[in-house]
Amino acid sequence: MAVADIKTAKIVKENARSANDTGSPEVQVSLLTARINELTPHFKANTKDHHSRCGLLKMVSRRRRLLDYLKGKDLDCYRALIEKLGLRK
């Protein structure tokens, strides 16, 4: 259920600060969002899969921590990323 390599490369290319950037918070949040979005339909079909749900909650909390860090460091970048990923209604 991992995000495909081609999709990962596309996400990294769209959100990277420089050519070889894979570790910036923007890239990490975007990759986590893609993984979370891929797992969400699984839990609608498999409501009793608590072990995988625990992993999903860890990903969500990691994304939340990265977003909090980004909000403290660069508010404009944070707002642009939230808008781009559609995380807030």
UniProtKB/Swiss-Prot annotation:
Metal-binding recorded as keyword: no
Any one annotated GO CC term: cytosolic small ribosomal subunit
Molecular function via GO: rRNA binding; structural constituent of ribosome
Swiss-Prot/TrEMBL GO biological process terms: translation
Keyword vocabulary terms for this entry: Ribonucleoprotein, Ribosomal protein, RNA-binding, rRNA-binding
UniProt-listed HAMAP family: Ribosomal_uS15_B
Protein family per UniProt: Belongs to the universal ribosomal protein uS15 family.
Assembly, per entry: Part of the 30S ribosomal subunit. Forms a bridge to the 50S subunit in the 70S ribosome, contacting the 23S rRNA.
Job of this protein: One of the primary rRNA binding proteins, it binds directly to 16S rRNA where it helps nucleate assembly of the platform of the 30S subunit by binding and bridging several RNA helices of the 16S rRNA.
The protein's name: Small ribosomal subunit protein uS15
Organism of this sequence: Polynucleobacter necessarius subsp. necessarius (strain STIR1)
Gene (name only): rpsO
